[in-house]
Amino acid sequence: MNEFDALLARAVEQARALGIPVSARISPRVAVNRRAVTRFGCCIRRGGEYVIELSERLLEAEERACMQTLAHEVLHTCPGCRNHGALWKEYAARMNGAYGYAISR
């Protein structure tokens, strides 16, 4: 397990503690995307499992920035949250209020 993987587990735990219905099918391994230049992260559904990718640029970032990005992507695994609609925004607001994040679209 690397540092991103441990942070992902924490982000999932935080969301579940707030009653946010994140998927039980999130890969525990965070993929590092070495080509991403316009985004910090993404959530991809592959074969019934969600894979979270983070930009290589976050390897040198502070833990808080990584946590916020992971939390953002974890919310996309919730039913009805593939985009940044009202439900996703509601869950982001819960995470922001509880943990001091600034998750936004």
Where are the regions a protein language model picked out?
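Active-site-proximal or metal-binding-adjacent scaffold patches in catalytic folds
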Residues: 1-68, 77-105
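Walker B catalytic acidic pair
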Residues: 73
